[in-house]
Amino acid sequence: MNREILFRGKGNPKYNNGDWFYGYLLFDGDDYQIVDPRYGSCRRTVLKETVGEFTGMTDKNGTKIFEGDIVRTQPFYDRPYSATRKGKQFLGVVNLHIHTFKGNKIFPEQKYNSFWQVDIIEDTEKYNHYNWSRFWNCEVVGNKFDNPELIKEEEQ
């Protein structure tokens, strides 16, 4: 399986006006930097907490989905939702979840498993889904850095 390795980060206001940069991720001391091909080989210093990886997937409009994006989605099926939620759309945040587990006697080294997941917040309940094929009409509606109010509205 091949996918485009791409990162994004929001520009550090100390160095630029807070634009989003997309490209290759570099570390320079304590600085996180993105080399955005749109601007040649210039490095752009970005805020560490805003760095997110491209999932390799796009939404129904062809928009690339990055870690930290807020997506509106509707599950194909009810589980784990009750029948009263059937057909309802949900907002969720895209996150990369990394799990570690111990090996066995044959392979004692520690193992890692990672997958993309949508953490759905509805009322006071939280759900998560890691099987993207179970979603349809997924649409990026913002991200948790520029649009935190979308998640706060869902939590209330």
Residue ranges and their predicted role:
Residues 1-156:
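Secondary-structure transition motif
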